Design a protein with these regions (language model features):
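Thiamine diphosphate
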Residues: 1-194, 201-206
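Single conserved hydrophobic/aromatic residue that forms the stacking wall/gate
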Residues: 213-222
């Protein structure tokens, strides 16, 4: 999306301090981490290909260990269409265990302010591979997100589902101007990612939250 000619300049990735855990370090060099004063020090990883590059023209917001501060930045961007007449598309990516469990009141306030954007609860679930063990094993963040009326929550299993949901969210929030924001949980587990089925109404069923993955009558499963 950042590389898209029409949308790219409006997309802002936000992380607290876990960009490498989520495999986002490639963005450091490509788009830079925003700093109002630029790079003032030599980072420890300066000799690596994907080093920690800060820039006055950086796009990514790397806020450090502060979920509240990161969510505040997301809210500012998610409401800029109203407060500054400038539509932005923020993606806040965080450990799902440290999302709604820590900033639920801010998420509720964002809903009241009619925020629009995407929250990505990464390394979610009880079986995903986390770097710090059980304290990161989230299995209940969707219960919390479901209490916010204008937060639409999804737990996709496959990449094509994620793509369909994000495309639908972009259309709903920014084209149709509906007042929702999206919470999506993703994992880092290794399993087969099948191609998108060529079945009728597949996109519609993904958005509804239920699709036919296999059929008992099929000779072979996907």
């Amino acid at each position: 999306l950042i590389k898209d000619d029409s949308l790219g300049e409006r997309v802002v990735p936000i992380v607290p301090d876990e960009a490498r855990t989520f495999g986002m370090e490639g963005m450091f060099k490509q788009i830079g981490i925003y700093s109002s004063e630029g790079q003032l020090y030599e980072p420890e990883d300066a000799d690596q290909v994907m080093w920690y590059k800060e820039s006055e023209t950086g796009v990514m917001l790397e806020e450090g260990i502060t979920e509240a501060g990161s969510f505040a930045a997301w809210t500012a961007l998610a409401t800029s269409y109203s407060s500054h007449n400038l539509t932005m598309i923020p993606f806040y990516v965080f450990y799902s265990m440290f999302g709604f469990q820590r900033v639920h009141d801010l998420a509720w306030a964002a809903g009241d302010a009619q925020a629009k954007g995407f929250l990505i609860g990464a390394t979610s679930g009880r079986t995903t591979l986390n770097g710090e063990g059980l304290q990161h094993q989230d299995g209940h963040s969707h219960i919390l997100s479901s209490t916010i009326p204008n937060c639409k929550s999804y737990d996709p299993a496959f990449g094509y589902e994620l793509a369909v949901i994000i495309e639908h969210g972009l259309k709903e929030m920014y084209q149709d101007k509906e007042n929702y924001f999206y919470y999506l949980t993703v994992t880092n587990e290794r399993y087969i990612q099948p191609p998108k089925p060529k079945t009728k109404n597949i996109d519609e069923n993904i958005i509804k939250g239920c699709l036919l993955y296999t059929s008992d009558a099929a000779d072979e499963c996907l």
